[in-house]
From Swiss-Prot:
Belongs to the TBCC family. It comes from the Eukaryota. InterPro entries: C-CAP_CF_C-like (IPR017901), CAP/MinC_C (IPR016098), CARP_motif (IPR006599), TBCC1 (IPR039589), Tubulin-bd_cofactor_C_dom (IPR012945). This is TBCC domain-containing protein 1.
């Protein structure tokens, strides 16, 4: 029987993409979800699929959520669904045709979700629930720090934003093990509950209920590397008997099924810790002298199933790293403690997390699900993404193209939101493969996720003024046809660019009409170059320019080298991580 020993673990994707890295609403407790589970089974239009109209009624009328928040969770759950790129592009096209709120509501009402899986998804939000008791462990009592009652809750919420458990596979396993009875209770039919709402001892789970658990659980059998959703894993008759399956009723004994899962549950073998310990190491980054820790880049893409493919980039410092490798296609990327770096990942990606990065620029290919920025400082991010989430970050600038409202969590300060402003030759092809369109684009309509019961901090962000807007040029030669930013710029930004271009043309004409002699031209050229070098140093652009060059080129000649011979960058070998797209 050892041949059929099952190993079941929590899937990474619902925790990584589905769980919002913030304290959930108090109405997502088991008390209210138990009521919702009974309610949806007795109302038309709620079971087995729950439409937006009924969820809005439940969320706003029963759970007292704001409509924007209700749609946020509904939309986030939809990001987890395995829809094709064509389906997502069709949905984006339909939304872009909505010109009034009534038309938008009508379109949203066409969206529905699996009811049981959505219940599990809502319960899963408890992963990042703050415990007042645990948040105070380790502090002296009385605390030497004065903390006003009004700020304490927001500080704790900002802390959970920066220390969320979305990547922590041990936390995922502990959560499932601890809350397994309640998770299964949400799947039990109302007729198997007592008058007080408690699960009866001889309760059963339908095959459909077990199938819904595949949102959270997957696994394999011993001596096999093939990973299956949990309901397909149980298609083996030997495992069915262990899990309490009855052929007569075509259902599982709840108690026996729970015992089976408790024995089978184990740590996800494709988590971030295993990736860094036993994954393949990539020599993409330079080891820069003067840095305390070595840059580390690992991947598990050679062995992990879809949704669990990871690339970890840690301590990438003081360099430019540019890649459009197939190793990045549809992977989850985590950038940890990168500083003073310029990173270009120009491939279609699955999700991206920036954690504790500072003084860096990150340019991404289209991200199918979410980009999450947490505990970062002075970081510039340029991305096309299904969702953008920012928490606990300071002085960051984000240029985005996104069909959903950017989600601003507690703890942010001095954020700047600007329109997407770059291109590379294969960008539009990558967007199509990721199911991301140019419209709708809600980059300038952020949703502030505040502490429950208090007003969100509307002063934590600003929309970039057109006078500060400059397009970003990706400094690499790549094959492809596209040479334009895929989305049109807002009118005021476009006018600002045209005005600036006109000023440059007028300045060039003034220089031409001055009729300088040869000595005057040399003097004028020297002055312009001097001012240019001063500007490079003042703005920090000199560091980026230097990092584009091979180590054999001295930084002192970087500006001249770049302006006189751009093709040199393309001639570097694929082993050279700086200044070339490999």
């Amino acid at each position: 029987m050892d041949k059929y020993t099952a190993y079941v673990w929590p899937r990474l994707e619902p925790f990584l993409v589905g769980v919002l890295p913030a304290t959930p609403p108090s109405k997502f407790s088991m008390h209210y979800l138990r009521k919702m589970a009974s309610y949806v089974r007795t109302r038309d239009g709620c079971f087995p699929r729950l439409g937006w109209q009924m969820w809005r009624h439940i969320a706003c009328g029963k759970l007292q959520l704001a409509e924007d928040l209700a749609w946020l969770y509904f939309e986030t759950f939809d990001l987890l669904m395995p829809r094709s790129a064509e389906q997502r592009l069709e949905w984006a096209e339909a939304l872009s045709q909505c010109h009034t709120q009534k038309e938008l509501d009508r379109q949203r009402c066409k969206l529905s979700v699996d009811t049981l899986q959505f219940l599990l998804f809502l319960y899963l939000q408890q992963l990042n629930r703050i415990s007042l008791r645990t948040s105070l462990i380790g502090e002296e009592w009385p605390s030497p720090r004065s903390r006003s009652p009004s700020s304490s809750s927001s500080e704790r919420d900002a802390k959970i934003s920066s220390q969320n458990k979305n990547w922590d596979v041990q936390a995922h396993l502990t959560f499932i093990q601890t809350h397994l009875p309640e998770l299964l209770e949400l799947l039990v039919e109302p007729g198997q509950l007592s008058s007080s709402g408690q699960v009866l001892r001889d309760s059963h789970l339908t095959s459909e209920a077990v199938e819904s658990l595949s949102l959270l659980l997957e696994g394999s059998v011993s001596h096999s590397r093939t990973v299956h959703p949990v309901h397909k894993l149980l298609s083996r008759s030997q495992l069915q008997s262990q899990a309490g399956f009855s052929k007569l009723s075509c259902s599982y004994s709840l108690q026996q099924f729970q015992d089976f899962l408790r024995q089978a549950l184990c740590l996800n073998p494709f988590g971030i810790s295993n990736c860094s310990q036993s994954g393949k190491k990539l020599s993409w980054a330079l080891q820069v002298e003067g840095t305390l820790k070595k840059a580390k880049i690992f991947r598990n893409t050679h062995a992990a199933p879809p949704g669990s493919r990871l690339v970890l980039m840690s301590q990438v410092c003081k360099q430019t790293l540019a890649k459009d490798s197939e190793k990045l296609n549809d992977v989850n990327i985590k950038l940890h403690r990168c500083s003073e770096a310029f990173i270009y990942l120009l491939s279609p990606l699955w999700s991206v997390t920036l954690d504790k990065c500072r003084n860096s620029t990150l340019v991404l290919g289209p991200v199918r699900t979410s980009v999450h920025i947490q505990s970062c400082e002075n970081v510039r991010v340029v991305c096309v993404a299904g969702r953008l989430t920012i928490g606990g970050s300071f002085n960051c600038t984000i240029h985005s193209l996104t069909p959903t409202r950017p989600l601003l969590l507690p703890g942010n300060a001095s954020l700047t939101l600007g329109p997407f402003h770059t291109q590379y030759p294969t960008l539009e092809d990558h967007m199509a493969s990721a199911g991301l369109a140019v419209v709708p684009n809600l980059w300038n309509q952020p949703l502030l996720f505040g502490v429950e019961g208090s007003a969100p901090d509307t002063g934590c962000y600003r929309i970039q003024p057109p006078s500060e807007f400059y397009p970003l040029v990706i400094p690499f030669q790549m094959d492809g046809d596209n040479c334009e930013i895929p989305c049109s710029l807002p009118e005021d930004f476009q006018k600002a660019l045209e005005s600036r271009e006109k000023t440059i043309e007028e300045w060039q004409k003034t220089v031409k009409d001055a009729h300088l002699n040869k000595a005057q031209r040399r003097q004028f050229q020297a002055l312009v170059e001097q001012k240019f070098h001063e500007w490079l140093l003042e703005t920090g652009q000199r560091q980026e320019l230097d990092s584009l060059l091979p180590p054999t080129i001295t930084p002192s000649s970087s500006a001249e080298h770049w302006s006189s011979n751009q093709n040199t960058l393309k001639e570097q070998t694929h082993e050279q991580p700086t200044g070339t797209v490999c």
